[in-house]
A protein has these predicted regions:
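Short intrinsically disordered, low-complexity coil segments enriched in acidic
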Residues: 1-8, 66, 76-78, 87, ...
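Pocket-edge structural micro-motifs
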Residues: 25, 57-58, 73, 84-85, ...
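Beta-strand->loop->alpha-helix junctions that form or flank phosphate-binding loops
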Residues: 56-58, 68-86, 109, 134-138, ...
């Protein structure tokens, strides 16, 4: 099973055991509930209690720098893709499209790219071929309320992004629409 957990859920979970856990981001979110960024970060990192493999966005290396962690991400300055702490020269990006072994996967926005790279990291851990994974992702559509195209008319596009409930997620959605 694949489960997405919020800091609210992680805060009260007793058994957090899993085979693989992924941490995509840590932002100063929900401080009204958690009071400090340090407490919020500690709760989010609780996802790694009693787990097999830890996969973390490379942008979080400053918070979690450990030998038992596998990092993923895209380093824009050098156009480097990292999957499970290894540079992947056979994966590259050109014009908001991820390319691998003759397969081209379009994506909308940096946050979507981060999600794709997290998926590829899990697939790599499970020894599932990237080509199969990317081919499957080509048929993926955004879930309802997440940058969901509602209507296009007279060169105007209307999107529903009501799942963006904080400034960071709204900013990410707006940036992806500008691309």
């Amino acid at each position: 099973a694949i489960v997405e957990l919020s800091s609210y859920q992680l805060e009260y979970m007793v058994d957090k055991s899993s085979d693989i856990s992924i941490l995509l981001n840590i932002t100063d979110d929900h401080l009204d509930r958690h009071e400090t960024f340090e407490r919020y970060s500690k709760i989010k990192m609780g996802i790694f209690d009693n787990i097999g493999k830890k996969i973390i966005n490379i942008s979080l290396k400053k918070y979690i720098n450990s030998d038992d962690v596998k990092y993923f991400g895209y380093i824009q300055d050098t156009s480097t893709i990292i999957i499970n702490s290894e540079k992947k020269d056979n994966l590259y990006i050109n014009n908001d499209t991820l390319h691998y072994d003759g397969i081209s996967l379009n994506f909308m926005g940096y946050h979507t790219l981060q999600n794709i790279l997290a998926v590829l990291s899990v697939m790599d851990c499970l020894k599932i071929n990237f080509a199969k994974c990317l081919t499957a992702l080509m048929s993926f559509t955004h879930p309802p309320h997440r940058i969901e195209l509602v209507k296009r008319s007279n060169n105007i596009s209307w999107y529903n992004d009501s799942k963006s409930t904080n400034c960071d997620s709204t900013d990410g959605a707006l940036k992806s629409l500008r691309q």
